[in-house]
C-alpha cells in the first residue's frame, strides 16, 4: 500500500516530467533560404552592397557586404541593430540557409534567435572554415551571441542550438559573443 507521502512524491515527479516535456517542446526550428537573387538591392557601389531579404513571420533580413565580409541583421530597424555592424574577422561569405529558433512560450511561435553558417577564408589553397553564428533576434537588442567552429566540433549544430536556446533570450548585447566548444578557425587570444 502506498502512503500519502509517497503518493504525493510520485505525483510531483509525474508533474515535473510532464511539464518538462512540454517545456522542451516550446522551442523548435524553422528555416529560410539565403538567396540574394530573391532580395531587394537597397544600395550598391564599388565598395559593397546591402540587400533586404524575406525572413520569417514578417521579420526581414538585412544582408550587407563590404570589404569581402558579410553582415546580417534582422527586424524592421535592422540597420540600427548591433548585428548590422558585426561580422567575422576573416573574409567570408554566407551559407544557404538560416535556422530560426522559435518559441511558443507566449502561445504563438515567435523567433528569438538565428543560426547562420559563415564560410571564412583560410590560408591559400586550404579548405574554408565554417562558423555557426548565433544571433539574438529582438527589436533593439539584435546581436551576435555565440560563435561555433563547425569543423572543430562534430556536434556543432547542437552546440549552436543550445547557445541559441540558453544564452540568446537573456544575452546583453553590450557583451562580446561567446566562443562555444573547440575553436580553431582563427586565433581568439
Question: Where are the regions that the model predicts?
Answer:
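Flexible, glycine- and charge-enriched loops at secondary-structure boundaries
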Residues: 58, 84-88, 153, 157
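C-terminal partner/receptor-binding element of secreted or periplasmic proteins
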Residues: 149-189
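Charge-rich, low-complexity N-terminal segments
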Residues: 2-7, 20-85
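Short helix/strand-capping turn motifs
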Residues: 88-154
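Intrinsically disordered and other compositionally biased segments
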Residues: 10, 23, 106-108
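Bacterial N-terminal signal peptides
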Residues: 8-18
Amino acid at each position: 500500500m502506498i502512503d500519502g507521502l509517497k503518493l504525493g512524491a510520485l505525483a510531483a515527479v509525474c508533474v515535473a516530467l510532464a511539464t518538462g516535456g512540454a517545456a522542451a517542446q516550446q522551442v523548435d526550428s524553422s528555416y529560410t533560404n539565403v538567396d540574394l537573387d530573391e532580395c531587394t538591392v537597397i544600395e550598391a557601389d564599388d565598395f559593397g552592397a546591402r540587400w533586404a531579404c524575406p525572413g520569417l513571420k514578417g521579420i526581414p533580413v538585412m544582408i550587407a557586404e563590404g570589404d569581402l565580409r558579410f553582415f546580417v541583421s534582422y527586424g524592421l530597424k535592422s540597420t540600427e541593430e548591433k548585428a548590422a555592424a558585426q561580422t567575422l574577422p576573416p573574409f567570408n561569405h554566407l551559407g544557404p540557409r538560416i535556422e530560426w529558433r522559435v518559441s511558443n512560450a507566449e502561445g504563438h511561435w515567435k523567433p528569438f534567435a538565428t543560426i547562420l553558417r559563415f564560410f571564412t577564408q583560410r590560408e591559400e589553397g586550404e579548405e574554408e572554415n565554417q562558423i555557426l553564428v548565433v544571433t539574438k533576434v529582438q527589436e533593439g537588442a539584435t546581436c551576435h551571441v555565440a560563435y561555433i567552429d563547425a569543423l572543430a566540433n562534430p556536434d556543432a549544430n547542437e552546440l549552436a542550438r543550445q547557445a541559441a536556446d540558453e544564452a540568446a533570450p537573456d544575452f546583453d548585447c553590450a557583451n562580446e559573443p561567446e566562443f562555444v566548444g573547440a575553436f580553431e578557425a582563427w586565433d581568439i587570444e
